[in-house]
From Swiss-Prot:
Keyword Repressor applies: no
CC per GO annotation: mitochondrial outer membrane; mitochondrion
Disulfide linkage: none
EC number from the UniProt entry: 2.3.1.15, 2.3.1.51
Motif HXXXXD motif: chain residues: 205-210
Protein name, per record: Glycerol-3-phosphate acyltransferase 2, mitochondrial
Species of origin: Homo sapiens
Reactions catalysed according to its record: sn-glycerol 3-phosphate + an acyl-CoA = a 1-acyl-sn-glycero-3-phosphate + CoA; a 1-acyl-sn-glycero-3-phosphate + an acyl-CoA = a 1,2-diacyl-sn-glycero-3-phosphate + CoA; 1-(9Z-octadecenoyl)-sn-glycero-3-phosphate + (9Z)-octadecenoyl-CoA = 1,2-di-(9Z-octadecenoyl)-sn-glycero-3-phosphate + CoA; 1-(9Z-octadecenoyl)-sn-glycero-3-phosphate + (5Z,8Z,11Z,14Z)-eicosatetraenoyl-CoA = 1-(9Z)-octadecenoyl-2-(5Z,8Z,11Z,14Z)-eicosatetraenoyl-sn-glycero-3-phosphate + CoA
Chain residue ranges for the region called Disordered: 1-21
Subcellular location: Mitochondrion outer membrane
InterPro entries to which the protein is assigned, alphabetical: GPAT/DHAPAT, GPAT/DHAPAT_C, GPAT/DHAPAT_LPLAT, Plipid/glycerol_acylTrfase
EC class of the enzyme, as a word: transferase
Subunit-structure text: Interacts with PIWIL2.
Domain of life: Eukaryota
């Protein structure tokens, strides 16, 4: 795999002395400086608008057109102007003076307010089932409440917060080149906070540094001390004690006990009282909606859903009239110290371990000019009360993946059921089980909705673009980088960089230095070669950040590939594939099949969006990007002829959430629509590029289907996942498909096959065990499953 960094493509040997390669990194590329024209002087999209379907009032009232014109600020850049003083001494002590000037509101009488809260008092007086009643000694109960409260939080220490902010500011300036924040997004959040409603930030989770960087950012912007809901499993006791004094919150282990446990009832009542007190006092709260980095599990965090449940319950009972939810995301060029060891990813971070990691980061960056960049994204706030009242879902009847896909995989039927997929990988913990069933569903849909908004508002960094080009485009990095940047902006996503093209490429390649090799083949020409093995796996993980931008087109391209799989040879020319007519019904069916196969954690469909609405969106995207062209069949009314259309009676009474084809009022007319693949010169390469974006996941699924013949079953879920991961690694060594050798892809394949009915789970004394279902015990059905998956893969 070779990629040219210059305009001409050459084929030369890849070998080069290591000393000569090292000189390439140190001496620069020696190429002509060129300005980035695609996004300088063009409209930069303002991303992060809230859902107009679920929260229309917030969409209009909590947004101001003027804020889109504001620029960016570097939140870790503190100068003399950021303090009240001036002079040469201030310029040397500006970090320290800035930390002293930060306003930290005091927290007084918190334990007494918690004890006097309605929930705790009702529990102590025996007014709720499981209450202690009059039989217990009040002093012992108060001590138990204080013990639970001490596990949850501690009053923030102003001196410690200021000292930590000063040290963190110095550390961030050594680690990061800049931490960019859109001034318009910050202004939007500040204006929303002026209404007096509490802010609840719901964030993605790239690294443990997110929980430190976001509070520092909000403190520097004058929004006070951010209370962070941490995961107890990710921190040691000593680190938890430090984080509590800095404003951290931890869920007590008793809160996950059974519903009839008195200890669990008391712990949940205390946590609920703590959340209510935070919301009443107006302190901002940060909740992570994703699992901690390195955790092998579902993307949506069960702990994050539990914290969201407490906030929803506080608003529903009227403790606070409303709360403003702010989707947040933090993106990095490279995630600092991302855990990559499957055996040690779940180990808690200790205080001394964290200190050594900080020192190691500082030592590695000492004298290094290539520091990483970061971007903080604050999406448009929206009203939680409005979402509770007006949130709607297109889910009517739901079916499991086994009911939807298994008959089609086995060839027993061809029609796709007109229903949504039910797939919930995130376990429901004790705090969420304590809510009503409809409230549990509300919390799950809200969490999925906000996580989708956070991912959609994330900017694409230069390293993600570079990794994608190195994996899936093999021509000219300079030209393709500009093209891909423009395609991202045209789709309403933002990029986390700007500057000159040569500098951007040099910056990203320097950060990816451990995974690529630079070879000079002639004067002015440079060859970029990805390192085989783990380097390709790392590049595939980086390129996955680009998938949300092109996800609709990628799903559509793979669906078209599946539709053409049985008609033309896989290696057939593009002109031969463009001759075939593709009906709209066939396209809908293939898109639905692929949608059901792909995990919900990847698609992140909003609950207010139906599958058929998404199918229409995918088809529209394929037409807009020029891959599909409408074909007028003889005797049919042209698609552009809207003058003779008449309103159908059934359209007049459709639900407002039912978004169907706007060009046709009768489904019978839509059935007759046909499309062809476009014959434009750029279409074959772009079609292949879109298909390859989903190829790591689909190839992992196909290899998991082939592994059914070799897997040792029955086994535990973790044991079988480890078996599959070792098989993916062995296959990668043989075939060179290293982008599939990812433990997250392995566990995603195992869970998908479990939902599909390929694997069945049975209880045992040692825990649940997986075994092969009788239906897929035959080699014939296993081959049908593998062929069903491989039809969507473009070789």
């Amino acid at each position: 795999m070779a990629t040219m960094l210059e305009g001409r493509c050459q084929t030369q040997p890849r070998s080069s002395p290591s000393g000569r390669e090292a000189s390439l990194w140190s001496s620069g590329f020696g190429m002509k400086l060129e300005a980035v024209t695609p996004f300088l002087g063009k409209y930069r999209p303002f991303v992060g608008r809230c859902c107009q379907t679920c929260t229309p009032k917030s969409w209009e009232s909590l947004f101001h057109r003027s804020i889109t014109d504001l620029g960016f600020c570097n939140v870790i850049l503190v100068k003399e102007e950021n303090t009240r003083f001036r002079g040469w001494l201030v310029r040397r002590l500006c970090y320290f003076l800035w930390s002293l000037e930060q306003h930290i509101p005091p927290c007084q009488d918190v334990p007494q307010k918690i004890m006097e809260s309605t929930g705790v008092q009702n529990l102590l007086s025996g007014r709720v089932p499981g209450g202690t009643g009059e039989g217990q000694v009040p002093d012992l109960v108060k001590k138990e409440v204080q013990r639970i409260l001490g596990h949850i939080q501690a009053p923030p220490r102003p001196f410690l917060v200021r000292l930590f902010s000063w040290a963190l500011l110095r550390f961030l300036n050594c680690l990061f080149l800049n931490v960019q924040l859109h001034k318009g997004q910050m202004k939007m959040v500040q204006k929303a906070a002026q209404a007096g409603l509490p802010l609840v930030l719901l964030s993605t989770h790239k690294t443990l540094l997110d929980g430190i960087l976001l509070p520092f950012m909000l403190l520097s912007q004058g929004l006070g001390v951010l209370r962070v809901a941490w995961d107890s499993r990710a921190c040691s006791p000593a680190l938890r004690a430090l984080l509590r004094k800095l404003g951290g919150l931890f869920l007590p282990p008793e809160a996950s006990l059974s519903l009839d446990s008195s200890e669990g009832l008391l712990a949940r009542a205390v946590v609920q009282a703590v959340i209510e007190q935070l919301l009443v006092s107006g302190q901002p709260l940060l909740i992570f909606l994703e699992e901690p980095p390195g955790a092998l599990g579902p993307r949506l965090s069960a702990l994050g859903q539990a914290w969201v449940g407490f906030v929803v319950q506080a608003v529903q009972v009227g403790i606070v009239p409303d709360a403003l939810l702010v989707p947040v995301a933090v993106t990095y060029d490279l995630v600092p110290d991302a855990p990559c060891d499957i055996d040690h990813a779940s180990a808690p971070l200790g205080l001394w371990t964290g200190a050594l990691a900080v020192l190691r980061s500082l030592w590695s960056r000492w004298g290094c000019s290539h520091r990483i960049c970061s971007r903080v994204h604050l999406a448009q706030p929206f009203s939680l009360q409005e979402y509770i009242v007006s949130a709607r879902s297109c889910w009517g009847g739901r079916q499991t993946l086994e009911q939807l896909l298994q008959p089609i995989v086995l060839g027993q039927c061809t029609a796709v059921p007109d229903t949504e997929k039910e797939q919930e990988w995130t376990p429901i913990t004790g705090p969420l089980l304590a809510l009503k069933e409809e409230d549990q569903l509300l919390v799950r849909r809200l969490s999925c909705h906000v996580l989708s908004a956070s991912v959609g508002s994330s900017a694409v960094m230069s390293t993600a673009i570079m990794a994608t080009l190195l994996l899936f485009k093999h021509q000219k990095l300079l030209g393709e980088f500009s093209w891909l940047t423009e395609e991202i902006l045209l789709r309403g996503f933002d990029v986390g960089f700007s500057g000159q093209l040569r500098s951007l490429l040099q910056h990203s390649l320097s950060l990816l230095r451990a995974h690529v090799a630079l070879l000079r083949i002639r004067q002015g020409d440079l060859l970029v070669v990805p390192q085989p093995g783990p380097g390709l796996t790392h590049l595939a993980q980086l390129s996955a950040e680009l998938l949300p931008v092109f996800l609709s087109e990628a799903v559509g391209a793979c669906a078209v590939r599946g539709l053409l799989a049985g008609r033309v040879p896989p290696q057939g020319p593009w002109e031969l594939q463009g001759i075939l007519l593709l009906s709209q019904n066939e396209l809908y069916r293939q898109i639905l099949l692929l949608m059901h196969l792909l995990p919900q954690d990847l698609l992140l469909l909003k609950p207010c969006q139906s599958s058929y609405c998404y199918c229409q969106e995918v088809l529209d995207r394929l037409i807009q990007c020029g891959l599909l062209v409408a074909e007028e069949t003889p005797g049919s009314r042209p698609a552009c002829d809207t003058g003779r259309q008449r309103l159908s009676r059934k359209l007049l009474w459709k639900p407002s959430g039912d978004f169907t084809d706007s060009d046709s009022d009768d489904f019978g007319e839509a059935d007759g629509r046909y499309f062809r693949l476009s014959q434009q010169s750029h279409c074959p390469d772009f079609f292949l590029f879109l298909c390859r974006l989903l190829s790591p996941l689909l190839k992992a699924f196909a290899q998991a289907a082939a592994f059914l013949r070799q897997g040792q079953l029955p086994d535990t879920e973790l044991g079988y996942t480890e078996q599959l991961f070792q098989f993916l690694q062995a296959t990668a060594q043989e075939e060179g498909i290293f982008e599939c050798a990812d433990p997250k892809l392995a566990i995603s394949a195992v869970w998908t096959f479990r939902d599909l009915g390929v694997l069945q789970q049975t209880p045992s004394p040692a825990g649940p065990r997986l075994h092969l279902s009788p239906t897929f015990a035959s080699l014939d059905n296993q081959e049908k499953l593998e062929q069903f998956i491989r039809q969507f893969i473009c070789s």
